[in-house]
Design a protein with these regions (language model features):
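Structured beta-strand-rich core segments of catalytic domains in phosphoester-bond hydrolases
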Residues: 45-48, 52-128
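Conserved beta strand-loop-helix elements of the APE1-like EEP
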Residues: 71-86, 231-253, 279
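Active-site beta-strand/loop signature of hydrolases that rely on acidic residues for catalysis
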Residues: 16-17, 32-50, 116, 146-171, ...
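Surface-exposed cleft-lining segments at the edges of enzyme active sites
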Residues: 91-92, 121-140, 180-186
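N-terminal, active-site-proximal structural segment of metallo-dependent hydrolase catalytic domains
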Residues: 2-62, 72-75, 191
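Metal-dependent phosphoesterases centered on the DNase I-like endonuclease/exonuclease/phosphatase
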Residues: 60, 139-237, 241
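Active-site beta-strand termini and strand-to-loop segments that position acidic
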Residues: 80, 104-110, 247-248, 270, ...
């Protein structure tokens, strides 16, 4: 395992939908070199656990906890230090459920125990889809159950990941006509019922870190479609659907949060940008 940089006071958290981690190791190295994260939540690792690139991650100075499957889905938590506890999956999931959630508790010298829950939330496709939309409903319901039964809002909790919902209209950058068409056709990402599911997370006690620091920002997005070259267009066309949500104790320590466009501009990038937040003890 590589030697991590000396521990500094702030805790840096990154969430990154890699769209295949083995294809994005160059992006991972870039964000590690530039942002020096303590914990990285990976979504869409798209690799079964036995084929995960543990050696490559160790060379970057990180320990990996994984919950993956072949070809689709998959999540992981990469960290400078091993977590105290790890859990995988959601309450009442079937044994063959899609591998979409992993959580771990870390001991930070300044902040104390910090629990990071990392998820690749279902996209849902369309409210009329017979399986994908109900799967998205169930995922949000089970996540709420997890929070309500295992945690309290007074703890240091971070829920991070590709949440596949644009919470407010400022998170939508696909053009007014497309926005209206998506709503008219029932296409997922910002349907009223989806926003209601996300609101339950906020009601429990979580806050969107980026929106907290940038309340009126409407020109920064985390996902850009490959086919329409949304990242290359001017203005850029995308959605902000990757989030780092913090409980109130963590929110009080939040100092910075942003979206990393530099990684998205690299060759052979994921369609998602890494996002990050910094917490000072």
């Amino acid at each position: 395992m590589g030697t991590p940089k000396p521990r500094k006071q702030p805790m840096n958290i990154i969430s990154f939908n890699t769209n295949s981690i083995r294809m994005r190791l160059h992006q991972l190295k870039s964000i590690i070199d530039r942002l020096d994260p303590d914990v990285i939540g990976i979504q869409e690792s798209k690799v079964c656990d036995e084929d995960f690139p543990f050696d490559d991650i160790a060379e970057l100075g990180y320990h990996a906890e994984v919950h993956g499957q072949k070809t689709h889905y998959g999540v992981a938590l990469l960290s400078k230090t091993k977590p105290e506890q790890v859990f995988k999956g959601l309450p009442d999931e079937a044994g063959d459920a899609q591998r979409r959630l992993i959580g771990a508790a870390y001991q930070d010298p300044k902040l104390g125990k910090v629990t990071v829950i990392n998820g690749y939330f279902p996209q849902g496709e369309n409210r009329n889809h017979p399986t994908k939309f109900p799967n998205k409903v169930a995922f949000y319901e089970r996540l709420n159950l997890l929070l309500e039964t295992r945690f309290t809002p007074s703890e240091n909790i971070l829920v991070i990941g590709d949440m596949n919902i644009a919470s407010v209209d400022e998170d939508i950058g696909i053009g007014a006509d497309n926005q209206k068409r998506w709503l008219r056709e029932g296409k997922t990402s910002f349907l009223p019922e989806e926003r209601a599911w996300q609101q339950k997370l906020y009601d429990w006690g979580l806050t969107d870190t980026y929106r907290h620091l940038h309340p009126s920002g409407n020109d920064r997005f985390s996902w850009f479609d490959y086919r329409s070259k949304g990242f290359e267009r001017e203005p850029r066309r995308g959605l902000r659907i990757d989030l780092i949500l913090a409980s109130q104790p963590m929110l009080k320590k939040l100092t910075k949060a942003d979206i990393d466009y530099e990684a998205r501009a690299m060759v052979k990038p994921s369609d998602h940008c890494p996002i990050w937040a910094t917490f000072k003890g």
